Amino acid sequence: MSVGNVGKQREKTKDSSAKTKQKTLFGFFSKIPNVKQEKSDSTLSSSSNHDSNHDTPADVDNSSNVNKNSSSPERELPTSPSHHANTEIDSSSSMLPPPSSDPFSSPLSSSLHRSSPKRPHDSLGEESPGKLLRTSVKQEPDSEEEIDSPTKKKSFKSLDTSIFQAEDQFRHPVSSKLENSELSEVDKPFIASRRSRKPVSYAESDEDEDFDDAPTKGSRHKRIVSDDESDDYVEPDHISEASSEASLPIDEVESMDEDVDGYSDHSVSVAAPIPKKESRKESSNSLYESYRLGSQIASPSPSVSGSASPTKSNKNGVLNREEKRRQRMEAFKKENNERYEWLLDVRDADQNRVGDPNYDPRTLYIPPSAWATFKPFEKQFWKIKKDLMDTVVFFQKGKFYELYENDAAIGHQVFSLKLTDRVNMKMVGIPEASFDYWASQFIAKGYRIARVDQLETALGKEIKDRQRTQKEEKVVQRGLTQVLTSGTLVDEAMLTSDLSTYCMAIKESLQSDNEEPSFGICFIDTSTGGFHMCEFTDDIHRTKLDTLLTQVRPKELILEKSKISQKSIRAIKYCVSSSSIWNFIKPYTEFWDNERVEREIIAGDYFKNGLEGAPKILKSYLSEKPLAISAFGALFWYLRQLKLDKDMCSMGNFDEYDASQQSTSLLMNGQTLKNLEIFSNSFDGGSEGTLFHLLCRCVTPFGKRLFHTWLCHPLRSGTAINARLDVVELIADNPVIRDTIWGFLHKLPDLERLISRVHAGRSKPADFVRVLEGFQRINSAFDQLREEFMEVAEGTLLGEIIQSAPNMKEELEAWTRAFNWQKASEEGVFEPEIGFEAEYDTSQKYQSELKNELYALLEQYKKQLRCSSLNFKNIGKEVYQVEVPSDVKVPVNWCKMSGTKKTNRYYNDELRKKIKKLLEAEELHLAIMSRMQEKFYIRFDSNYEQWLALIKYTASIDCFFSLSQAAAALGEPYCRPEIIEQKDGHLYFEELRHPCINASAASTFVPNDVVLGGESPNMIVLTGPNMAGKSTLLRQVCIAVIMAQLGCWVPAKRASITPMTSIYTRLGANDDIMSARSTFMVELSETKKILDECGPKSLVILDELGRGTSTYDGHAIAYAVLHHLVSNIGCLGFFSTHYQSLCVDFMHHRQVRLMQMAAAVDEKIRRVTFLYKLEDGICPKSYGMNVASMAGLPEKVIDAAEEKASELEQASASFINASDDIALMSDFLQVLRISKSIEPLTAVNIPLILDSFE
């Protein structure tokens, strides 16, 4: 049709058009232009994250004619920077969104620039649609720019070729002269009509982004996303805007989604204004642009300048900014005028209200009437969310994960995510690519995370829908795939520590508070799939439970609701971190007993042959230890909620955990581990300054975890200790062996965790390659050790390990022939070698044939158009576009898809059909690859036991290597301890130093000689001034014993020990307010445990016992305890005290040696110089006044204190009868004697009185 005819026809329809223009333009503002910047004429990543996965019906026929298309919302045409530059418009209505902060900007990369979706009025100001169009078509680009690259939201068939009417067989793109002409009824298909605003809906489109191109470096996208269903989120590489001449492609505006309220949900701010460019005088293809923009303009006035006044816009029926806002808010209120009643009156699944004792905050009751009113997407969401009300649910919508309702409020309030504040279904969103980061952030704050993923692609759904006979709901299928908690993380990227993270279930059996409780314990490290179980009877102070919790330090706890005692809860709180997660679950229905566990094992496919194929430990516990099995049942149930039960249980990795291991290891209870700062320091609970931090120099993560176990249980057998020392000495003295070990260890990934992911079938191809490469290094290293060092290592523990390690050479060689390792590592896909997988080969061949057909078609087009420069161009999901020079005419039935100043890109029906066949073939090929990946993992997992054994042997070598490295770091002097097997205990250290302090202050630390047992007394009573180093000396002796029995060198010139059976410590002064126990009560309780459990080969450390009560009572208790230790038990140890008279009482005892920490005192200036030297004798005073002076107390206060101290000393001397034992003068013990009806006090029966005290 000519330009003149168009004008005449437009005049005839002018009146009718004016009547409808107000209605049709309302819909314009529900569409937001997608403004993006792309790399010029190269890989156009502007379409990479292009299409939204809207929840609109999946079976909508998009292949209808133009008239049908025009009745539905179309994508609008965004404008490039040049379209806005230098146009004569009102300064108050800016065409560009203002710079602002990015609420979704990920802290993972501070340099990453992300553009911001804006609401319509933010990006358009007060401009009318007509003004936007006119200003966008009246400018000339300075360089080759994208002037027409709409990316289709609809299917290929939706691009009806009838809109390209022409009389000639070939034509140029529509002339820009049509912009000033009137349109006839014939040309109305070029201008899509707009619908009025739809009700909020959660139906979704079946479009998918699987074939989007990844963003390329050099592209900076300025995206404006239309609504919360939009899945376009672009993460461009950071580049300088001045470094590229890439223009912003003209893109379609996404069709209106039915569940939006007019606000942009995924709003991401533009970092900086777009540089202005010179305007151009005329634009080509303006009529086509009008069609693409999708706005129906009744009578656009021809404007040369491209400017328009607000008044003129209003005359043309365009709403001003306030009117638009009002219309939008009215529509919003209409659909969201009241909140769901069941969200106001919250009840759990059993309809218990908040505050009810039986209220379960994990569930939500939704009445049947509400289900009937839900849209398909709402129904899908609430079906999952109603059982996860205590969990933040990340719901996948295309390229976003979205959080709704209370979860959205958390995201907004805690993490400042952009909130779409609806009355119902308020929402925040994050990009799909940043899920791991945001999930880690939520977990770090203590939240549980649920992940709901799309279980099918849009194209896959379309293929399935064609095969179904029954009509399905038009919503993409989604399902709960993961629930993440801090104690059950399995993804290596989310794990913040190389050490094990445990989730523990505790079952208690207790008849009354005064009885000894029994416990069943089961805990798991989900990153490796290892279960640990035990059952024991404890004392009323929960000593064994305290020891186990201190060793394991669980991150998450599962307890039986209303079935665990308050004493046990207090004991648990004392041992675990304040950040640990507590889960109280229902008895019987969730905290299963052994009968229920047995039924579930039989019913489920967890082990081969059901219960018969279960691990031996589990089967024996089922018949013998019901409490432990009940704890396992609770953990079993919990893992099922997290979708981890099959992955974890099917590994069969069960063992029995013995916290004390009394027959084989040095026993250290929880109190000792805390007092000696073995794993956590007393400052901030961290590992800095601890013995573990000093000694653990393992290279591999699985080596560190094994070393932690070694340190929890140092050896007791002299033979085993010497075997370890031999290996450590061999590695330390042989640099070649040391270098060989380090050479293969430092390149290994965390194989123990990675093979558990392979077993679960959740490993990425790149990680699977890392696993295979890691085992190749290990296998090669063991081969080298066998060939080169077997003669040296023979007869040692290292030689046994080298000989015992399985040789997996043949299996690994088979894997090298299975698939392309490089492609799997770099591209994340398994490409099997030809002939390895027939199904894959057939699918690959079919795809190649389809691609060949496409290129044959391209050659045909080259001949048809007589142009040899034609080629294919991929723009996002619109792949294989035929790129044609702009001066070449194309057939009339070719549909233009995008273009630049020099080239245009087209589709036609023939090309679309072939492309669709190729895309469907690729979709089916993905399913084949998924099945093939599963086969690979099953085959690898068939040798799980051999792989795990290889890891354990490697971890042991890593621990030996760590001990040799730690010895070298101790500083001189250090020595190999001499281990002496004899009946009586014996310790000898010459020039002993504290290893942790010595590591940072080697030149200033004062060493000391320590001798206990043998020909010397078993017990040293230690006196000395405050701050003289008594507590440090006590700790360094204990640590030296632990190091020696661990198999490590010790920081001494010479060391000789008899292996100890246990170490007990009573240090410091603390009360226990929660248990209503005073400082003195805590002291006596801990002392009572020591007296009950220590033996002749125990090392006991008591620091200032009796400080928590009066002088006489404290002295009496100290005397009685010390007498019992040296006379009845005969253990080795130190007893530090400030009771000088106590030394006098034991001056002639043959098993007591009186020693002091030396100090030089200047009485004139009240100055004490601490010498930190251990020497024989009794310190005459504690020099408290001198320490008070050093602390800065006022002189008047100190003078008064000295005067009072002198009076008290004289009064005590006159009162005490030198012939009486001071212990017998204690009022405390006299009261006890009367209350217990015990005979008159003697040194023999004082321990009996103390033992009766609780």
Swiss-Prot record:
Annotated Gene Ontology cellular component terms = cytosol; MutSalpha complex; nucleus
Q: Name one GO molecular function term.
A: ATP-dependent DNA damage sensor activity
Q: PROSITE patterns given for it? A: DNA_MISMATCH_REPAIR_2
For this protein, the record's InterPro entries field holds: DNA_mismatch_repair_MutS-lik_N, DNA_mismatch_repair_MutS/MSH, DNA_mismatch_repair_MutS_C, DNA_mismatch_repair_MutS_clamp, DNA_mismatch_repair_MutS_core, DNA_mismatch_repair_MutS_N, DNA_mismatch_repair_MutS_sf, DNA_mmatch_repair_MutS_con_dom
- Which segments carry the region annotation Disordered? 1-324
Instruction: From the record, give the cysteines joined by S-S bonds.
Output: none
Main location (coarse class): nucleus
Top-level taxon in the UniProt lineage: Eukaryota
Which stretches are tagged as biased composition: Basic and acidic residues? 8-18
Compositional bias (Acidic residues) spans? Answer: 204-213, 251-262
In this entry, which stretches build a coiled coil?
A: none
Keywords linked to the UniProt accession:
ATP-binding, DNA damage, DNA repair, DNA-binding, Nucleotide-binding, Nucleus, Phosphoprotein
Q: Which CDD domains match?
A: ABC_MSH6_euk
For binding ATP, which residues are annotated in this chain's numbering? 1024-1031
Q: GO biological process annotations for this chain's record?
A: maintenance of DNA repeat elements; mismatch repair
> Where is it located?
Nucleus
Positions modified as Phosphoserine? 205, 299, 307, 309
User: Which portions of the chain have biased composition (kind: Low complexity)?
Assistant: 62-72, 102-114, 295-313
Give the Polar residues compositional bias ranges. Answer: 79-90
Question: What function does the entry list?
Answer: Involved in post-replicative DNA-mismatch repair. Has a role towards base-base mispairs and insertion-deletion loops.
Stated family:
Belongs to the DNA mismatch repair MutS family.
This protein's assembly is summarised as: Heterodimer of msh2 and msh6.
Q: What is this protein called?
A: DNA mismatch repair protein msh6
Source organism of the structure: Schizosaccharomyces pombe (strain 972 / ATCC 24843)
List the gene name.
Answer: msh6
